[in-house]
Amino acid sequence: MKLSSTGRIFSTKIIAETVMFVALATVLSYIKIFSLPQGGSITAASMVPILWLALRRGPKVGLFAATIYGIVQLVVEPVIFNPVQVLLDYPVAFGLLGVAGFFKNSPLIGVSLGITGRFFAHFLSGVVFFATFAPEGIHPVIYSAVYNGGYLLIEGIISIYIIYLLQASKVLKIYM
């Protein structure tokens, strides 16, 4: 990684901004519209601050902040069955939201890809580690796709819509 002239990877300003956005995302994650029994919920757009930060600061900051957010989610609302599942469901899944930072000029594509990445990490975890929760006769792949897709599709639509509003109102451009 390239260090700045001060010998740091991130400036104090970017670290402070990252902490604020992760904190905001965490607070929003507590405002649940619906929660599922093995983890996952529809929230008050808790992914938006992380996606916005990724779009604002690019992939390096976005991936870092999103991974930190995943670790914070692990600490505050853990659902643990296996160490590999923990990695997939927290730092990897949430970390993939930072992919949005690669698409600063196409925010809706970036947000869609970040959320899709998160879905695939949760989906894989569901197939491998949560198959025992699938009702009898339902293949684990179908179960995981419906379980994870059900809440992430709604959460994703909410997030994409809010990012669209921020983009349409030029708020994203003001803060980039």
Model-derived features: where do they sit?
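Interfacial aromatic-anchored transmembrane helix boundaries in multi-pass membrane proteins
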Residues: 28-42, 68-101, 126-135
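Core segments of transmembrane alpha-helices
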Residues: 47, 89-97, 119, 155-160
